[in-house]
């Protein structure tokens, strides 16, 4: 699919708008002509953005996760987009830092709702026996 960036910039100018932030998977694909992995997998907006100005001289910036940046640069080659990656946990921590540095919650916070309910029923039963 060919990007519709030019047509959208034209519509922005017609409506007196300076620019647009495109975050939905469908609209991102419409603007750029391609989509990201997270848009395909999760269908959630915001993982990848296209920030565009109505001025044809200003390039559209694509903000995406660090691990998709190389693919986006390849897909957008020759289209004039600027790819701006942001760091995810992939870029921020190594696997040993993630796996060995995990802070576990204390045992009381790890109890399930059923455990809490059982404790509450026992406490109420004991209180009832003392009163009655």
PLM regions: where:
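A composition/biophysics-driven feature that prefers long, compositionally simple stretches
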Residues: 1-132
């Amino acid at each position: 699919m060919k990007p519709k960036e030019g047509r959208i910039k034209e519509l922005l100018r017609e409506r007196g708008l300076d620019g647009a932030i495109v975050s939905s998977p469908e609209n991102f694909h419409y603007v750029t002509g391609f989509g990201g992995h997270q848009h395909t997998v999760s269908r959630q907006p915001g993982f990848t953005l296209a920030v565009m100005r109505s001025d044809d001289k200003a390039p559209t910036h694509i903000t995406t996760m660090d691990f998709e940046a190389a693919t986006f640069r390849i897909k957008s080659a020759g289209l004039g987009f600027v790819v701006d990656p942001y760091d995810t946990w992939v870029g921020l921590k190594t696997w040993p830092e993630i796996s060995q540095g995990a802070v576990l919650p204390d045992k009381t916070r790890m109890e399930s709702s059923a455990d809490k309910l059982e404790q509450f029923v026992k406490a109420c039963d004991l209180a009832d026996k003392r009163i009655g």
